[in-house]
Amino acid sequence: MLSILVCHSYYLRRDQKQVLRAKPYPPLATLQVVSLLRKAGHRVAFFDAMLADGREEYDRLLQADRPQVVLFYEDNFNFLSKMCLDTMRRAACDMIASARNAGARVISAGPDVTDAPGPYLNAGADLALIGEGLSALLEVLPRLDSNPQASSADLARGLAGVASLGGAEALAGGVSKASALIPDAGLAAWDLVDMDGYRAVWLKAHGYFSLNMAASRGCPFRCTWCAKPIWGNQYLQRNATEVAQEMAFLKRSFKPDHIWFADDIFGFRVDWVAEFAASVRAADAGIPFSIQTRADLVSERMAEALREAGCREAWIGAESGSQRVLDAMNKGTTVAEVQVARDRLKAAGIRVGFFIQLGYMGEELDDILATRALLEAARPDEIGVSVSYPLPGTKFYDLVKAQLGGKTHWRESDDLDMMFHGTYTSDFYRSVRNLMHDQVALQSGGAPPASDEHRRVQHALDRRWQDLLSQELNYRSRPARAALAG
């Protein structure tokens, strides 16, 4: 059996927005892989970059343990990993080089690796796993164990979803599908997590402690902009009773005050959610939790089942208040469904957050104002606002690929640069984002609507909107200006 150092490259301290947000979670997918490798009999160490100040502990582990293999397995459940940030790619490539210098064989896996294995292989990785990569990983490791000096090409030979360097090219043997291995691996390796460190960050910033879980993998819907490098359009759902039992374990072992379900879509089927609610009660596993879902899945029965299971907050991909934009995104939902979902969840006592996306192809000022109107009418408790971000493997990326310049990835999560020829410049969308955040903050947590203070703040906010809109022509991008001139 092999000695393996498992790690990831998301350093919270390199992403200023997330430092201020102060909501770090242990790398769930990485910890699941640790559990899988332990079950296979390997000796496994773990480096968690999330709370690390720098690479010192990683370098210490390399020197002290002298692992035969260093596996970079990014947290596929973390939306920050899915964003493929340039800062984290640089961190990973530096860590790969150090591992090679320490004499280890290196395997790399994750969303960015799947999209662009070349940079990781050129940094020194022997192999890049394309997609989830678990089945391929469990075939590669015995080859390494029996022949530690095997070439990268020999290690990858005949395996789907494994890339290696052929000359200067990254060569991949097909694409692997998501495996059924993770549910069989048992619990994630929670014993290796610095729980005191995570708890301290949460308590200091928010006064409560949250941990993460996942009840499913993947999403079957086909929004044009949604990158799915790991699971594609598959949706693999765990047994509801097993999820409740895991929640009970976390409750007994670490006493979190809250659970974040990192699923792209939690529950999906109302019968599953109802079974989960019953299992939570039976196991005395109840912990308030937050989820992500879709507006068209929130029936009255679904809202009630979520309430019974302990859901306290649901995030909906509203995206836009313009039906024209939603249709262009192939979102498959309507503005009316978003409003109805908000109302049903509110009636069930569940807070609602909206994900809003600005700047999609063809979005005009009227569409942005329709989104503003949706926020005023639906009154979500919270919002997250981003701009359209073209990532490889999406229809959206294919449509705007020719417009991309030298910058193909955001540097960190608050970047919000427009990397294609949208209607407006990045500064305009950042201003709209700020106004929308302030509007929702006023609606959900400000002074009473009838008070003088509320009217004063609303008047100031309306004035800021007017000032921005009066200058909107100046914020139009060059292609948009050219179209107007034509």
Named regions from a protein language model:
Residues L2-V6, D59-L62, Q68-F72, D145, ...:
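Radical SAM enzyme core and accessory elements
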Residues L12-Q16, L80, D115-G118, F221, ...:
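Flexible glycine/acidic-rich beta-alpha junction loops that bind and position SAM and/or redox cofactors
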